[in-house]
């Protein structure tokens, strides 16, 4: 019996559409003429050069299904070879049924399927679930899918009072991603820790218009409050790594959530991570939400940055606030 799990494949679907930081600012000026927006603000504030945009007709499930289909083709697997499909994303086609069923139908899968949601930590929590289900013998192959269309949460009509919580919405990206987790005779997912600071949940909100109609609608992110919500989580993560006898500087690859370049730089400095250990995805893709971590893994595979036996760490950070660290042996 294979008592462990490992990530065996990572795939991504990046739409060809792009919107530059300059184009974002031009559109914002058209819709919010009262703002005296200084040129270059988006790039200076976030480090964004351009973001990925899906075709208007594409839904989150379409992006997820394309990444999943690509993964199955690369792995030379049939739909019948998958035991369980998980969908984990901020974005969604529907509230009912689970979006995983839509992705399964589009990829020809007939296995059980369900959604996992934890803001931008959805995929790393899906890895947690897949690892547990495989270790307990309930499944052998779990396909994790993600489809993000965060560009559609852009708030174009802003005034000075709403600029602080609305500007971040203009950095969201459209990305599809997929990971395959399989039973293994040797450890692949070697350890993980999950953390939370739930009293800070108001820092970033996207209220449901049907069930919370009296609340502010649209994506609202107080960047300062969100950054403060992670205070203490980084220290707990560092302490856990110390207990695992892991020196971050000795890792071959570090994947970290990338909501902005300044955020990545600040997190890297606090965790003593070398810039060369991180693949920067934000500047030319944007904030890919839950697809950010699999995007970096897929990019590392594409660039041949990963070899069998390499030590990898995934750092998840999400509104809520929640934090996670997962250690992998590739």
Regions found by a protein language model. Give the residues of each.
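Oxyanion-binding "anion nests"
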Residues: 208-254
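Flexible, glycine-rich active-site loops centered on histidine and acidic residues
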Residues: 135-173
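Phosphate/pyrophosphate-binding loops at sites that engage ATP/ADP/AMP, CoA/4′-phosphopantetheine
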Residues: 67-83, 235-252, 300, 304-305
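Acidic-glycine-rich active-site phosphate/pyrophosphate-binding loop
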Residues: 35-44, 94-108, 146-158, 208-211, ...
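Short beta-strand segments
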Residues: 88, 117, 142-148, 181, ...
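Condensing-enzyme catalytic core mediating Claisen C-C bond formation in acyl metabolism
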Residues: 1-56, 158-227, 329-330
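Active-site pocket-shaping loop/turn-to-helix segments
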Residues: 48-66, 114-121, 168-170, 216-236, ...
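Claisen-condensing/thiolase-fold acyl-transfer catalytic domains that form or cleave C-C bonds
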Residues: 61, 65, 91-92, 102-105, ...
């Amino acid at each position: 019996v294979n008592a462990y799990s490992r990530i065996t494949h990572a795939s991504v679907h990046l739409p060809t559409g792009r919107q530059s930081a300059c184009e974002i600012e031009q559109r914002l000026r058209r819709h919010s003429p009262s703002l005296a927006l200084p040129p270059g603000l988006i790039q200076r504030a976030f480090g964004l050069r351009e973001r990925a945009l899906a075709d208007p007709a594409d839904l989150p499930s379409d992006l997820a299904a394309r990444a999943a289909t690509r993964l199955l083709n690369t792995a030379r697997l049939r739909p019948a070879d998958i035991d369980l499909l998980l969908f984990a994303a901020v974005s969604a086609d529907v509230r009912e049924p689970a979006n995983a069923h839509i992705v399964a139908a589009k990829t020809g899968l007939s296995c059980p399927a369900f959604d996992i949601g934890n803001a931008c930590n959805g995929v790393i929590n899906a890895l947690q679930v897949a690892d547990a289900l495989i270790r307990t013998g309930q499944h052998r192959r779990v396909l994790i899918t993600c489809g993000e269309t965060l560009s559609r949460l852009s708030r174009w009509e802003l005034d000075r009072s709403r600029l602080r919580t609305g500007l971040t919405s203009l950095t969201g990206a459209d990305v599809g991603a997929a990971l395959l987790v399989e039973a293994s005779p040797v450890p692949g997912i070697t350890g993980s820790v999950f953390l939370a600071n739930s009293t800070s949940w108001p820092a970033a909100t996207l209220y449901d218009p049907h069930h919370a109609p009296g609340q502010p609608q649209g994506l609202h992110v107080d960047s300062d409050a969100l950054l403060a919500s992670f205070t203490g989580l980084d220290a707990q993560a560092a302490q856990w790594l110390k207990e695992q006898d892991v020196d971050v500087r000795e890792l071959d690859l570090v994947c970290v959530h990338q909501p902005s370049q300044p955020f990545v730089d600040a997190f890297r400095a606090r965790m003593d991570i070398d810039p060369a250990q991180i693949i920067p995805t934000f500047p030319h893709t944007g904030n890919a939400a839950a697809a950010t971590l699999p995007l970096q893994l897929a990019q590392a595979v594409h660039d041949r940055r990963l070899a069998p036996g390499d030590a990898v760490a995934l750092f998840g950070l999400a509104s809520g606030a929640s934090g996670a660290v997962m250690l992998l042996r590739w």
